[in-house]
Regions:
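Nucleotide-activated donor-binding/catalytic signature segment of Leloir-type glycosyltransferases, i.e.
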Residues: 251-267
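Short hydrophobic beta-strand element within catalytic cores of glycosyltransferases
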Residues: 304-307, 317
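A conserved mid-protein helix/loop that constitutes part of the nucleotide-sugar donor-binding site
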Residues: 20-25, 203, 207-229, 245-252, ...
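Aromatic "clamp/platform" in nucleotide-sugar-dependent glycosyltransferases that forms part
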Residues: 268, 287
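A short helix/loop element that forms part of the nucleotide-sugar donor recognition site in Leloir-type
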Residues: 50, 80, 186-199, 204
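A short, active-site helix/loop in glycosyltransferases that binds the activated sugar's phosphate group
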Residues: 148-176, 182-184
């Protein structure tokens, strides 16, 4: 690494999720120009995920780095990270996600010696939708303090950047937008309606989500109940692709809303994207979403998308052309937009065609606009800018 500038990435854990996969992709793309180090805490997926790294990347497991709050382990992780920064003397420390962002930035500040340039990618904010007001205020205060130890921030979308700057997380000149890279190739074996138990005459409306409160699936179910009551002549199937802690409560809610025969719960599916071709309309009812990969995957397959008007979701559709955005936690507004698409097959087709063109468009260099290659090129351009 002696003949190249060194970039040290720090992420809380390597798991089978978007932020981890994008960080791994970025590490691989940076090896021709940089010595690359990736430090992460332990996780059951870490061994498999680390195998995706090219051999040129120096992978370091930080034993005490974990997502959960633990003062003793957090202090140990901070000291471990400080020691690695002192040993490696990186030119750039690039932190990812909240916990690694906090400890990594503090470690860089405390390491002494030559100060690295500190870049932080939150991979979405936690300003609303996750916690109550007191806990959110504490997180916000902590992030404002940490902003003093941050040279540059990276947002996934203009919406994330705007909302972060509005609450005092850094200054606008410190922020750049670099979207997550999304693989929008069509699935090798696309699902058909019959594969999910959907009759040909039924309008399939679906969502892909971890079943936890911030994903807003409760409002998807309540919108489904409104549609069934208000439009008894339309035949719907509502598909929830994903598993999680709320699967049981959501199944019970579906029963209470008399949706037992109308809603399909697939549970966790590793091939979630392959199920999207069975749908007619895609819905993302999240209470907060940094960017939203699934709406892009759905649009790339020609589906119009209805999304919540939160953080980065409005940035991944074209309002009124490829889909609609609605206020969060508003089942009525969600139902109205779904109904508009359900009643008009021609509108669905036109929006679906526009959605496919939008999702699969190229950037100024001819790369897929939402792909990993475009993401990595923008990140490398930022590194070149900040190192002069």
């Amino acid at each position: 690494m002696a003949d190249k500038p060194v970039v040290m990435h720090i992420i809380t854990r390597l798991e089978a999720g978007g932020s981890s996969r994008n960080t791994i992709d970025s590490c691989g793309a940076q090896t021709p120009d940089y010595g690359v180090v990736l430090a992460a805490g332990p996780h059951p997926d870490a061994v498999a995920m680390a195998k995706l790294l090219p051999p040129e990347v120096n992978y370091i497991e930080v034993p005490h780095l974990q997502r959960e709050l633990s003062p003793i382990k957090d202090l140990r992780a901070l000291l471990e990270l400080r020691r690695q920064i002192q040993l490696l003397q990186p030119d750039i420390v690039h932190t990812h996600t909240s916990k690694a962002g906090a400890l990594g930035r503090l470690a860089a500040a405390l390491a002494g010696g030559r100060k690295p340039v500190v870049v932080h990618t939150p991979h979405g904010h936690i300003l609303y939708g996750y916690y109550g007001p007191v806990k959110t205020w504490i997180f916000l205060l902590a992030e404002r303090i940490l902003a003093r130890f941050t040279d540059y921030f990276i947002a996934l979308t203009p919406g994330e950047m705007r909302e972060s700057v509005e609450v005092g997380l850094g200054r606008a000149p410190q922020w750049r937008v670099v979207h997550s890279g999304v693989d929008l190739k069509p699935p090798a074996v696309p699902a058909h309606k019959r594969d999910l138990g959907i009759a040909e005459g039924e309008i399939a409306v679906g969502t892909v989500a971890r079943l936890e409160p911030v994903k807003g699936v409760e409002y998807f179910l309540r919108a489904a109940a409104l549609l069934r009551a208000n439009r008894p002549g339309l035949k719907f199937k509502f598909v929830i692709i994903g598993g999680g802690a709320l699967e049981g409560p959501l199944r019970r809610l579906a029963g209470q809303l008399f949706l037992d025969q109308t809603v399909i719960f697939t549970g966790h599916r590793a091939d979630a994207a392959a199920l999207l071709p069975a749908l007619d309309i895609y819905v993302q009812p999240s209470l907060n979403e940094g960017m939203g990969r699934a709406p892009l995957e759905a649009q790339a397959l020609g589906l119009p998308a209805v999304v919540s008007r939160v953080c980065g979701l409005p940035d991944v559709i074209r309002e009124g052309q490829t889909g609609y955005s609605v206020p969060p936690a508003d089942a009525g507004a969600l139902a109205i937009s779904i109904e508009k698409l359900a009643l008009d097959a021609g509108l669905r087709a036109r929006m679906g065609a526009a959605a496919k063109a939008w999702a699969l468009a190229t950037d100024e260099a001819g790369r897929p606009r939402w792909g990993a290659e475009s993401m990595n090129a923008r990140l490398l351009a930022l590194y070149k800018e900040i190192l002069g």
